[in-house]
Amino acid sequence: MKVYDLPDSHGHFGPYGGIFVAETLISALEDLRIQYERYRSDADFQAEFAHELKHYVGRPTPIYHAKRWSAQLGGAQILLKREDLNHTGAHKINNAMGQALLARRMGKSRVIAETGAGQHGVATATVAARYGMECVIYMGSVDVERQAANVYRMKLLGAEVIPVESGSRTLKDALNEAMRDWVTNVADTFYIIGTVAGPHPYPMMVRDFQAIIGREAITQMQEDYGRQPDALIACVGGGSNAIGLFYPYLDSSIRMIGVEAAGHGVETDQHAATLTKGRPGVLHGNRTYLIQDENGQIVETHSISAGLDYPGVGPEHAWLKDSGRAEYFGITDEQALEAFHALCHYEGIIPALESSHALAYAARLAPALTSDKLLLVNLSGRGDKDMPTVARASHITF
């Protein structure tokens, strides 16, 4: 019996979530909520979504047993949910596809998005091209520089990419600019938020579209292993890949571990470990944990991974932390790079730097467990986009 039923009708996960936006957006969000409530239980909408996930995105993604790496580490077996094998190379397309289908049904001709690592931008540009929609992507200028390949992909796909020069010039600033655009152009524009943050109904909607990850995993684990894993491990920036894996498992007793970016260490001010070091506040339309100073001002974050470099986190993760249902830990840049190289070496898989944080935690946990234990890691994306960053960190030029 399903007992977990959050958010409530106002978008709250306990004290988190909700709607904290300018008056000009209230009616747009209410319309979005009504339309989403209508279509989330609409058989035709769900059938089209399932069809697109299968025939365009390439789902289901397999679960792969990383045997050589598991043997090298000793202890538990590491299994990978291969979201890197989706069209466009990450989990982001699951949500972008769902929201694009909703936008079409709402009669919107233009989509906008924010992006950090560029994967959500690429996914949004991809579905916009698929459906013939105008597309504008907001991206912090720092991220434009470190994710140049993804910027070019977006442009190839027909999107206009607008570099954001304000603030720390990263994901939170891109989100601010996208919100401003939406306020101005709400009549014809649909804002495809890329993570489980923002005002209600976005955290719920993005979670629901990403929950295909966990639903597939439940079926695949039963078919391939005759049981479910002992722990689920996923990286957390905003937290959409993690909640996509966790949500279908929430009523079980399976251990859930979210892995944040500890950057140069949580004892420094150069990290993005929101749940580890932050405290509650309001940002981007919802109440959640934030990295802020004593005056409540958002502090600049750091991670080698552009997709984890965010000072907030999805409100559902804030609730899962407080309730004790999920645990959250930090992994440093250095530890993530080590896991990145290990997966390349032992398994012939180049992971995204975001996913490498989850892999690094699995590598720490596995040796402490017996060999009959199964750790399911969400390999949220592939690492092609991170080649320049990894090369720089390794003092290699090409």
Curated annotation (Swiss-Prot):
<keyword id="KW-0456">Lyase</keyword>
<comment type="similarity">
    <text>Belongs to the TrpB family.</text>
</comment>
<keyword id="KW-0057">Aromatic amino acid biosynthesis</keyword>
<dbReference type="GO" id="GO:0004834">
    <property type="term" value="F:tryptophan synthase activity"/>
</dbReference>
<dbReference type="GO" id="GO:0005737">
    <property type="term" value="C:cytoplasm"/>
</dbReference>
<keyword id="KW-0028">Amino-acid biosynthesis</keyword>
<comment type="subunit">
    <text>Tetramer of two alpha and two beta chains.</text>
</comment>
<dbReference type="InterPro" id="IPR023026">
    <property type="entry name" value="Trp_synth_beta/beta-like"/>
</dbReference>
<feature type="modified residue" description="N6-(pyridoxal phosphate)lysine">
    <location>
        <position position="92"/>
    </location>
</feature>
<dbReference type="Pfam" id="PF00291">
    <property type="entry name" value="PALP"/>
</dbReference>
<comment type="pathway">
    <text>Amino-acid biosynthesis; L-tryptophan biosynthesis; L-tryptophan from chorismate: step 5/5.</text>
</comment>
<keyword id="KW-0663">Pyridoxal phosphate</keyword>
<dbReference type="InterPro" id="IPR006653">
    <property type="entry name" value="Trp_synth_b_CS"/>
</dbReference>
<dbReference type="InterPro" id="IPR006654">
    <property type="entry name" value="Trp_synth_beta"/>
</dbReference>
<keyword id="KW-0822">Tryptophan biosynthesis</keyword>
<protein>
    <recommendedName>
        <fullName>Tryptophan synthase beta chain</fullName>
        <ecNumber>4.2.1.20</ecNumber>
    </recommendedName>
</protein>
<comment type="function">
    <text>The beta subunit is responsible for the synthesis of L-tryptophan from indole and L-serine.</text>
</comment>
<dbReference type="InterPro" id="IPR036052">
    <property type="entry name" value="TrpB-like_PALP_sf"/>
</dbReference>
<dbReference type="InterPro" id="IPR001926">
    <property type="entry name" value="TrpB-like_PALP"/>
</dbReference>
